Amino acid sequence: EVRGAVGENLRRALDWLPTARTLVTIRTDCDLGETVQSIDQSLDLKPEDERLLLELFAQCGFRTWLREMEARLGVSAPGAGSGSTQVGLEGAKASGNMAGAAPEATARAPAPYVPAHPIPDDPAERRYETVMDEAALARWMDRIAAADLVAFDTETTSLDPMVAELVGVSLSVEPGEACYIPVGHRYAGAPDQLSLESVLSRLRPWLEDPAHLKVGQNLKYDTHVLENHGIRLAGIAHDTLLQSYVLEAHRNHDMDSLASRHLNRRTIRYEDVAGKGAAQIGFEQVPVDQAARYSAEDAEVTLHLHRTLWPRIEAEPTLQHIYREIEIPVSRVLQRMERQGVLIDASALARQSDELGRKLLELETRVHEAAGQPFNLGSPKQLGEILFERQGLPVIKKTASGAPSTDEEVLTKLAEDFPLPRLLLEWRGLAKLKSTYADKLPRMVNPRTGRVHTSYSQAVAVTGRLSSSEPNLQNIPIRTAEGRRIREAFVAPQGCQIMSADYSQIELRIMAHLSDDAALLRAFAEGMDVHRATAGEIFGIAPADVSSEQRRYAKVINFGLIYGMSAYGLAANLGIERDAARQYIDRYFARYPGVRRFMDETRLRAREQGYVETVFGRRLWLAEIHSPSGPRRAAAERAAINAPMQGTAADLIKLSMIAVQKWLDDGGLASRLIMQVHDELVLEVPQAEIETVRDGLSRLMTGVAQLKVPLEVGIGVGPNWEQAH
């Protein structure tokens, strides 16, 4: 008997199986009318051009086919390297790769830059040295001391920068030349290596000297690793991860992708030297000779990438400003925030976990009662049977396999009319809150610091927004009491308070600035309640006479239009007829013609350029703006309208972080930035500094840029994050 889901599916399809067998059976008794002697002769196939295929596979990044063709010909592909890294699974490269995990896009990006510096195509021309003695180390110390710019990278024992230990260091000062200094390889038969202490004592003066300029790929990680060993990295001049992000935010930014895209060069992946899956070993167990090829090329490729990407940025003043004045300095601020971490109340989270567990059990009982039978709430298959077969609810959409979908979008739509989906959504929300935060956060406390250390990624969102992971601070819900309880567990240490500084209606203010709409500018300039003012304009009444319901409608319209909401979306959001929603939108644009003009011009510019820009000149690429698919193209046009607002808000909060950190340092204050979430900065402030920091935050954040409308910041103080609002 075939058991489980496979058996169940077979039994349900018994009547159809004979037809299925007929469909998949290849007929060999067909009358072809003539005998086919040879497929090759019939199709007139020409011999494949193996050399041309080799070049094509290299250009397109078809790695498996490329390796097979190389093996067949006994050669390497043009530009293929003999060894380096995937910037993503090991140490310093890990967060670089994860941070650049955006899908490749189809927008009309600039043509690849042709590097002015010759790149050795033949692996034999590349000179990689493994530094195994003091004499070799001394030679390389002389070389990096004399170089104008040095590519630098670390190899480590862990993806977590707070616990990673150094295994080796790679350096490159010239095209085709690099070295690897192993200090921590441990395996049976490993050769003698220079001691970690002796290497760091020699490197420390150079690493900590701001006059010696360094370039790397995601140097934020390497800075953490060196701090684990008591070294504060200085002289960070360039970062190829950030260069790529500034140029083409919609592309991948890991080193494999960058080397392939810009250098036509294939790098060795981490799996090639360390294995993958359950068999993967730590880098400290990788044989030194393999590690040397991998890591030395990593530094060398970084140097090549910088020499390829930097001239493109240097040629455009606005991009150079984004890179030099925002991305490079904010990377340093983020590293310090990550290092500082945040204190959490583990006992409070444990209590909340227990409470959530009880609520989930109660909800599960209610769900089973509403369904008329018990079932596994975590099983999409069983849930689909309950919703669509037993209860007969309408199928909103289907999965790729053809089954009715039970995702959040579907349940949200069904919840408008049916009680069971509403209960399921509530159960899912609480279950995620419990597993992701109440249960997981205490396990993420670093035993050495007693704090939780999130990781901020700069190169993920095409808008310039930051993202965070382990834990993800951006997704903690704030609209529910349970979500707010999670924020209560982010606490201040004794003698300090949590201070939150949040930009008020920042995207609406940016819309007013960009659209130059007179009525919208006036509402902000006069300090009016902008939603009440909008309601007055739409309904043709004085703002003082606007009802709470009318203000709610106006608020939905204000924020909805920023995100390109259609009449259909507005109708669904407000629970009104589509014709009524269309009338509201028409009235809005009649009262705010500058907003409509801005939207129309932005769509046109996006189609012409393939990107839109922030107030500061950051380019926001739109991958699907020329898609043949109407829905995808429409989504890209909606994104084009919102991206300048989101992107400018991202630039403003980054500039604020830079300004606040400099002010704290210059003033010798003990207050510390500890989190950045959406449009909010969160600090740990000693009691004696509260008024000073409150005044400084307000002044710096409202004055970080001069827009056509004033910037406003709401500042709160409390013993925990929630009470600071």
Ranges and model annotations:
Residues 358-365, 369-422, 590-638, 642, ...:
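C-terminal polymerase-core module
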